Amino acid sequence: MKVRASVKPMCKDCKIIKRKGAVRVICKTSPKHKQRQG
């Protein structure tokens, strides 16, 4: 999980979702692409 000021999709499988007021990126194919805005 990376904490970043700006989250961007890193591949075609990355999905941007809003969870509990935080913007997140989840990715099934490569979980190291997971990000959270903070």
From Swiss-Prot:
Xref: SUPFAM superfamilies: Ribosomal protein L36
GO CC field: cytoplasm; ribonucleoprotein complex; ribosome
GO molecular function annotations of the record: structural constituent of ribosome
Keyword Ribosomal protein: yes
Annotated keywords: Ribonucleoprotein, Ribosomal protein
Source superkingdom: Bacteria
Entry keyword annotation includes Ribonucleoprotein: yes
One biological process term in Gene Ontology: translation
InterPro entries per UniProt: Ribosomal_bL36 (IPR000473), Ribosomal_bL36_sp (IPR035977)
Family statement: Belongs to the bacterial ribosomal protein bL36 family.
Name recorded for this polypeptide: Large ribosomal subunit protein bL36
Biological source species: Mycoplasma mobile (strain ATCC 43663 / 163K / NCTC 11711) (Mesomycoplasma mobile)
